[in-house]
From Swiss-Prot:
Cellular component GO terms, alphabetical: small ribosomal subunit
Ranges for domain S4 RNA-binding: 96-159
Function (record text): One of the primary rRNA binding proteins, it binds directly to 16S rRNA where it nucleates assembly of the body of the 30S subunit.
Assembly: Part of the 30S ribosomal subunit. Contacts protein S5. The interaction surface between S4 and S5 is involved in control of translational fidelity.
Signal peptide as annotated in the record: none
GO terms of molecular function: rRNA binding; structural constituent of ribosome
Protein source organism: Leptospira borgpetersenii serovar Hardjo-bovis (strain JB197)
Family of the protein in this entry: Belongs to the universal ribosomal protein uS4 family.
HAMAP family: Ribosomal_uS4_B
Name under which the protein is recorded: Small ribosomal subunit protein uS4
CDD domains: S4
Gene that this sequence comes from: rpsD
Record lineage: Bacteria, Pseudomonadati, Spirochaetota, Spirochaetia, Leptospirales
Amino acid sequence: MARYRGPVVKIMRREGVDLFLKSSYTFNKDKFHRKGPPGMPTKRKGKVSEYGTQLREKQKLKRAYGLLEKQFRNYYEEASHSHGVTGEILLQLLERRLDNVVYRLGFAVTRRQARNFIAHRHVLVNGERVDIPSYRLNVGDKVEIREKFRASTFIADNIRLSQSLQGIPSWLSADYTNFGGDVTALPERHHIDLPVKEQVIVELYSK
């Protein structure tokens, strides 16, 4: 499946916010906080149109979860045909992806790294190997790191970093002794720390 594999700090500068695409080990905040988006500097900054604002919010969310347009559109279509608030359901569907849960549990420092672990079959769901990053988890599902990969320095370092920095969302429970975690509830809007206005994205797609 196609993926963006280019520089991620440039993406975050374009969106103007930290999308948690870069590990804290290697994140150069000086680069991120350079004034303005990447590219040649411009003398004037024109007023952003309503469409421009909607587009930027969509791009932020797509890029945070590492999705291309077709994938993202499919999530939106599913959310729009579900009962409830479309924007919140969209976020919930994205949060329930396996790559995101591996990241949220602290076994990976970025969603991109989590996708790599999953693609190499280092992750188990309910005792079975799963190599699909978009695999959707349900309440009661158990995620584990494969036994042969548990000794990796990546995992030990990531767990230490996670415990000291981000913490685990309350809809998940982590068991670091056994290199696993459980989905204990469905994520709600207040659990999701991304600086995105999901209703603006709904307005863009509903035109």
